[in-house]
């Protein structure tokens, strides 16, 4: 099947097929040249486009009324599932220049396995990734759904579908499952149901939402995740419909600020309300916010705390010290000023706390070379960031012989 790409009024392109392996040929060459086969590489934040399997996912909904409403809306609206999922305004394909956005739809999977498994393995093999932690894409907006019951039903359906259709087929693919955070009791039950499933390495809260993480209703969920020795992640996102973000008139602006803003709010509440003291063994991961905001937060919170420590009586040390014990995903790593980046690495103890993430197949993804080629990180530090830290954060056990990759 050919797909016409409307690149401009003057130039059009008809594409007969799309192959991830060809797209990432240079990434494959990098992985060979740099010898990635000599140490584990774990990608803690990759994505798939679950809307391309949306009708499959809806079959896993329990509520027959909501299932019928969702199926009808999805059938009417098409693959994006508009009418079911909250809309996210944005121009991630940069006016058609990032061609894999439309072209991925015509890429075929391999016989005998789910298409999501095939496509994921192709980019993993090209980049030299041993294990990838997979997240949804449009569903990162699900926390903004006006109907809490719909968020809960879709979250449970997606989690069940992912475990049965994807994670069970390929041990190299793992996931931190979606928690419907607008319903604290449903979140708790989600951890109970899925905490021991194969391929589940933790749980994830989408950050673009308006529920305070310090609310007492979530304490038993945090306690259960801690008891299971699993990490909890806050995955960043943006919401252009939010009033303060609506003042920005360009996608570049809301993408730059939105992906940082919500995690800044949640991390502040997490630290100031002493949740690291209440759950000292619960590992927290802050995903897809980049790194440049962290020195600012450390300095800002420390400065306020030194003047008003009575308002954070549960803390036993500076906010920055709690932050240095947390984990952070690397992408999108701000590399415009190497001196500033080196300072950031030092402040967050990157060699033990930073986790490599690609964010593939999103438009601003980072290859492992983003970490491997840094001039100021030791060889041991690079290997820690690319895989060793994730093994510790997720308790991932790799076989003695590294997982085979396609040559």
Predicted regions and their residues:
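Short catalytic/ligand-binding loop motif for oxyanion handling, primarily in non-cytosolic enzymes
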Residues: 49-52, 57, 131-134, 140-145, ...
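Mid-to-C-terminal alpha-helical segments outside catalytic/metal-binding sites
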Residues: 2-40, 55-131, 160-168, 189-192, ...
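Divalent metal-dependent hydrolysis catalytic cores, especially in the metallo-beta-lactamase
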Residues: 41, 46-47, 103-110, 121, ...
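Active-site metal-binding loops of divalent metal-dependent hydrolases
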Residues: 46-47, 359-361
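Short glycine-enriched, charge-decorated loop/helix-capping segments at active-site entrances
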Residues: 147-152, 370-373
